[in-house]
Curated annotation (Swiss-Prot):
This is U-scoloptoxin(11)-Sm7a. Residues 1-15 form the signal peptide. Keywords: Disulfide bond, Secreted, Signal, Toxin. Contains 8 disulfide bonds. GO terms for cellular component: extracellular region. It comes from Scolopendra morsitans (Tanzanian blue ringleg centipede). GO terms for molecular function: toxin activity. Expressed by the venom gland. Transmembrane segments: none annotated. Its main location: secreted.
Length: 219
């Protein structure tokens, strides 16, 4: 999973064309590079340093950057540790205190951003991640904008509320990265139906070298 940004947020957010992608529909190879238990990136300040998701298959943990100084990024499922911000079904973990008092995101608000930067002066790989508002509970994570320059990659996400699925829509994609599962929800099932979580119930399966993706439809 390859989430998130910030060079100057306002410059970045207005300097490239809108692109609609879910967080796992793009850059899967790059996400897979960051899906191990280690990361080569250093957090610039009190950025979010990891993502956790407790889904139907497992507890998915994605370290993003190493906290500065003696701080360690908390990788345990503890929403009350003071270092967790819940964004939909994903727990953002912070190097120190999580932000409080954020407004709730609207459907078109940029919710969080990320930047991966190669600092040529220090020869270090740096990550900067900022959160601007709090996502509601039932949302999808949607890649709004992306920018790539030499040594820099930036992304911006919004988190619109889930709409009701049509009969042909995928309600969730379940990604299997070597028995490390991550889920992306797209819509909620109509009354009387549910989104399956058994992998053998997948409506479609897409196999690649680095992962298997299971597409579920409401039943």
């Amino acid at each position: 999973m390859y989430l998130f940004l910030m060079i100057n947020y306002f410059v970045l957010a207005n300097s490239f064309d809108f692109q609609g992608y879910s967080m796992n529909a793009r850059n899967e190879k790059s996400k897979q590079k960051r899906s191990s238990s280690e990361t080569d990136y250093v957090c610039i300040s009190n950025d979010y340093c990891a993502f956790l998701q407790k889904n139907t298959q497992n507890l998915y943990t994605l370290p993003i950057c190493k906290c500065p100084g003696d701080n360690e990024c908390p990788l345990t499922w503890d929403p009350d540790d003071g270092r967790t911000l819940i964004q939909g079904d994903i727990h953002f973990k912070f190097c120190s205190s999580a932000p409080v008092g954020l407004k709730q995101c609207g459907s078109d608000d940029i919710a969080y951003t990320a930047m991966w930067n190669k600092n040529l002066k220090t020869n270090t790989s740096e990550f900067t991640g900022e959160v601007f508002c709090e996502c509601p509970k039932e949302v999808t994570h949607f890649l709004m904008k992306t920018k790539n320059e030499e040594g820099i990659e930036g992304q911006a996400y919004k988190c619109p509320k889930l709409q009701t699925c049509t009969s042909e829509e995928i309600c969730v994609h379940i990604y299997n990265y070597t028995n490390n599962f991550f889920e992306i929800k797209y819509c909620k099932c109509p009354d009387g139906q549910s989104c399956p979580d058994e992998l053998n119930s997948a409506a479609e399966t897409d196999v690649k070298k680095e992962r298997i993706r299971y597409g579920m439809k409401c039943k």
